[in-house]
A protein has these predicted regions:
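Serine-centered coil/turn micro-motif
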Residues: 47, 87, 279, 371-372, ...
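Membrane-embedded transmembrane helical bundles of large multi-pass transporters/channels
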Residues: 1-37, 115-118, 122-363, 456-635
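Juxtamembrane segments of multi-pass membrane proteins
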Residues: 39, 48-53, 59-66, 75-76, ...
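Structured non-transmembrane domains adjacent to transmembrane bundles in polytopic membrane proteins
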Residues: 81-137, 373-496, 513
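Generic low-complexity, intrinsically disordered segments
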Residues: 71-72
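Short, surface-exposed recognition loops or helix-turn segments adjacent to catalytic cores
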Residues: 57-58, 96, 140-143
């Protein structure tokens, strides 16, 4: 079949065959991909702070122990202690704390890495039935139990969010276009593209860290954007131009190839900027996002036309909701352009002032779930025995230095207690008075410790522990923000300049998105929501994803010579639905139990909602002003 313009028939058979082969290869490659739910996995095993902690763990039996905690005045039978101690993954029963009126504590060191989910998971699964068969009420705490529980909760949250995103996107599309089956058809290239991208990612990284694990859910909303624009363009060609289904599909493909490619490249560019981060969590998010975005793009431009050509024509020619209201909106925008611009400037000024007082969350533990049983038990132990749940660790090369350090009577006021670790020479636990996971508190206590060590003229020492890892994440976070944001913006501008063949238009398209981010920062400040590592992750994502609507709007603006009614008739509904699906994909994380995922979803959804508003209302005003200015210069 050849259309009136001489466009050749779509190669459905070879494209479908290639897709099947690639899908089978990807499925085989994905078999070894693991999920890493450890929050400190955001640093990566090659980070100096992690390497120090791991090296300390190798020479320190029981540094990361499995703790069995029994209710006050309840004890663990000696036979059950021996049963746990005899497990192949348990190295030794290292210590026991039993005090009247307090919880009984039994510590077991592991033969492998206690922070490795695969090893810790085996241990926890073996110990769980032993504890459930006891008459005493006991539970597990410590690093192994926490890692397993966090991992399982994360896995459950991601599956739940994925299902919710699928349902929301399907319902949204079915409601707007009134054809549910077409929504399911759209998911085929998106799902295959996600699989291809994850398979490519697994060739580079063996595991998905906390942020990278959210990519499949995000790309449902992002990837389906291409499908929606293609379907809307087909509807426009059938209804307005009178083309047949086959001609409409091929015409839409050629007409949208450039804007879809540019929009995809802006998303890939954003993820590439994140991939350059020093923080492993951001880098993994960037690598996974770049691969998956590319996979979804390739699947959509190759497989989607074949799917649409197989659909009944009535699926593409029916009426859609909100078509007429959007066309009416175009007339209102034309009349109210100055008022819209004034309102945008006023909102931006207020938001900028409020954003100047935005707090930053330095206690990364507040991004973790508080209802995790292992963490509850760990906190109870700390309160009952007067110990910090996560002390700072100091390892002196000379064990005599550790003895002198602990014997010093002029202890800093920021330090509550000092304890040595049984049978580990030179290792001291520092229990601060204030929460060491808050940046200012950690810096204060470490400064006091350094002054104390200098005053005593002690030898070489190493600082480690969970608070030190938290401080390292904090340090890299602020460094990456200053680097990633300008890089992402620069790459997006380059892509837009290449795709639009203009130098000024990319700044016009990107400006409303910057305003949207300022509005969100101002809203967070006014509502008391602090910025965090999560906020830093969504900013470049919103720039790369939110710009897609502006790309399609500016392309349609050029095709229709600034006729806003015609622009909205062709692509206005698609812009609304695509950004709405992205909002639904991010918003699906709000149902998660993990505060980090909830914040990730809520903040990104709010920013994209701002993108939708400025793209529909403000961007046409800016484009109209730019067109008028160019006409004036021409005269």
């Amino acid at each position: 079949m050849t259309d009136s313009s001489g466009v050749a028939r779509w190669p459905t058979v070879p494209v479908t065959f290639a897709g099947i082969v690639l899908t089978l290869l990807a499925a085989a490659q994905l078999d070894g991909l693991q999920l890493n739910g450890d929050l400190y996995g955001l640093l990566g095993d090659d980070d100096p702070a992690v390497m120090t902690f791991r090296d300390l763990a190798k020479v320190t039996t029981g540094l990361e122990e499995l703790l069995v905690v029994c209710d006050p005045d309840q004890h663990m039978p000696r036979d059950d202690i021996r049963r746990i101690e005899s497990l192949p993954e348990i190295r030794a029963h290292t210590r026991t704390y039993i005090h009247p009126g307090k919880s009984s504590l039994y510590a077991f060191s592991l033969t492998g890495d206690a922070a490795d989910y695969r090893h810790a998971g085996i241990v926890v699964k073996q110990v769980a039935p032993i504890l459930s068969a006891m008459t005493s009420t006991c539970g597990m705490a410590g690093t192994p139990a926490y890692i397993v529980e966090t991992h399982d909760n994360l896995n459950r949250d991601l599956i739940t969010a994925l299902v919710v995103a699928l349902v929301l996107v399907t319902l949204l599309f079915a409601f707007v276009y009134r054809i549910g089956w077409l929504a399911f058809a759209m998911f085929i290239p998106v799902a295959l593209g996600i699989e291809w991208g994850l398979a490519a990612y697994s060739l580079v990284r063996p595991e998905l860290t906390l942020f990278a694990a959210a990519v499949p859910t995000l790309l449902i909303g992002i990837g389906i954007d291409h499908c929606i624009h293609m379907i809307q363009a087909c509807r426009y060609s059938i209804v307005r131009d009178g083309l047949s289904r086959d001609d409409a599909v091929l015409s839409a493909w050629w007409r949208l190839l450039r804007p879809i490619t540019v929009a995809s490249l802006t998303t890939v560019a954003t993820f590439c900027a994140l991939a350059a981060s020093e923080l492993r969590g951001f880098a993994d998010l960037g690598i996974a996002g770049a691969f998956v975005s590319t996979g979804v793009y390739v699947a959509c431009i190759t497989l989607l036309p074949a799917i649409l050509l197989a659909c009944p024509e009535r699926w593409l020619s029916g009426k859609a909701a909100f078509d007429m209201p959007l066309r009416a909106l175009a007339g209102w925008i034309e009349k109210s352009g100055r008022s819209i611009a004034v309102a945008a400037i006023a909102i931006t000024a207020i938001a900028t002032y409020a954003a100047g007082n935005l707090d930053v969350l330095s206690d990364i533990r507040k991004l973790e779930s508080t209802d995790i049983q292992s963490r509850i038990l760990q906190t109870r132990i700390a309160e009952e025995y007067g110990l910090s749940a996560s002390p700072i660790l100091i390892r002196f090369d000379d064990s005599d230095d550790a003895i002198e350090f602990m014997a010093d009577i002029d202890r800093p006021e920021s330090v509550a207690n000092l304890f040595d670790v049984t049978d580990i020479k030179g290792l001291v636990q520092v229990h601060p008075v204030a929460n060491p996971f808050i940046r200012s508190n950690f810096e204060a206590v470490t400064w006091d410790l350094e002054r104390q060590i200098e005053r005593l003229e002690l030898g070489a020492w190493t600082l480690s522990g969970a608070p030190a890892l938290n401080a390292r994440i904090d340090e890299l976070l602020f460094a990456d923000i200053r680097f990633v944001l300008p890089l992402a913006a620069g790459l997006i501008l380059l892509v837009l300049a290449f795709g639009t063949h203009s130098i000024g238009l990319p700044f016009v398209v990107l400006l409303p998105l910057v305003l949207s981010l300022i509005w969100v920062a101002g809203a967070m400040s006014m509502t008391g929501v602090p910025a965090s590592v999560v906020t830093a992750a969504i900013i470049p994502l919103v720039l790369g994803i939110g710009v897609d609507g502006g790309v399609h709007l500016s392309a349609a603006w050029h095709r229709h010579n600034g006729d806003l009614t015609a622009v909205f008739a062709e692509t206005g509904l698609a812009i609304v639905v695509t950004i709405a699906t992205s909002i639904a994909a991010f918003g699906a994380f709000i149902v998660a139990t993990s505060p980090s995922l909830v914040q990730f979803g809520a903040q990104a959804a709010g920013a994209l909602l701002g993108c939708l508003i400025v793209t529909l209302l403000l961007l046409p005003v800016i484009l109209r002003h730019r067109l008028t200015a160019e006409a004036s210069r021409g005269q």
